[in-house]
């Protein structure tokens, strides 16, 4: 990968390493999918780390980081990794929040990505999709965007089944980015 893309994956690896208390294996930057070509250099990477430290997510411990998933939608297999999952148990109900870190300079994230992640996590955990929320964190600005409502399985089946290009948005096969 290009040096800038490598720094993008290094940001994701840094977030994972930051939460050392998790019992997950630490992945090396080259083992992680994706990357962000908009991370210019080491100074920019440090600026992203500093910006992350100012977000609400820096003070919360994720339940899972870089959580892999595989999901079949409209007869197509979608594989990927969810950047972070936060779990909330209020005693009566367990809910989850999926967060996708966006390290680029633009706001080009597609809510369908979160819809796929949400469905994958809900089905993996055996919980209703309504108990899973999802957000993009634009790390550079600290802005959190929670698209709502997100389509469920039936709507995703219709959307992805109707795609004439044969590509699946945000799957590894289609080159999902960060």
Describe these PLM feature segments.
Residues 3, 57, 109, 126-129:
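Short, surface-exposed helix-loop/turn micro-motifs enriched in polar/charged residues
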Residues 5, 9, 69-124:
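Non-catalytic protein-protein interaction segments used by genome-maintenance enzymes to assemble
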Residues 121-178:
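Metal-dependent nuclease catalytic regions and adjoining charged, substrate-binding loops involved
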Residues 16, 23-32, 94-99, 137-142:
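Short acidic (Asp/Glu) and glycine-rich catalytic loops that position anionic groups and cofactors
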């Amino acid at each position: 990968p290009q040096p800038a893309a490598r720094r993008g994956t290094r940001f994701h690896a840094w977030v994972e390493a930051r939460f050392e208390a998790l019992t997950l294996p630490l992945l090396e930057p080259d083992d992680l999918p994706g990357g962000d070509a908009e991370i210019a250099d080491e100074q920019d990477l440090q600026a992203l780390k500093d910006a992350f430290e100012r977000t609400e997510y820096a003070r919360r411990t994720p339940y899972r980081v870089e959580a892999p998933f595989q999901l079949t939608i409209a007869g197509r297999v979608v594989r990927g990794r969810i950047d972070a999952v936060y779990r909330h148990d209020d005693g009566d109900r367990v809910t989850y929040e999926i967060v996708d870190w966006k390290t680029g300079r633009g706001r080009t994230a597609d809510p369908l990505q979160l819809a796929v992640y949400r469905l994958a996590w809900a089905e993996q955990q055996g919980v209703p999709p309504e108990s899973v929320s999802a957000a993009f964190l634009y790390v550079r600005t600290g802005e959190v965007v929670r698209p709502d409502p997100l389509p469920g399985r039936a709507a995703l089946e219709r959307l992805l089944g109707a795609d004439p290009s044969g590509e699946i948005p945000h799957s590894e096969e289609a080159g999902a980015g960060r």
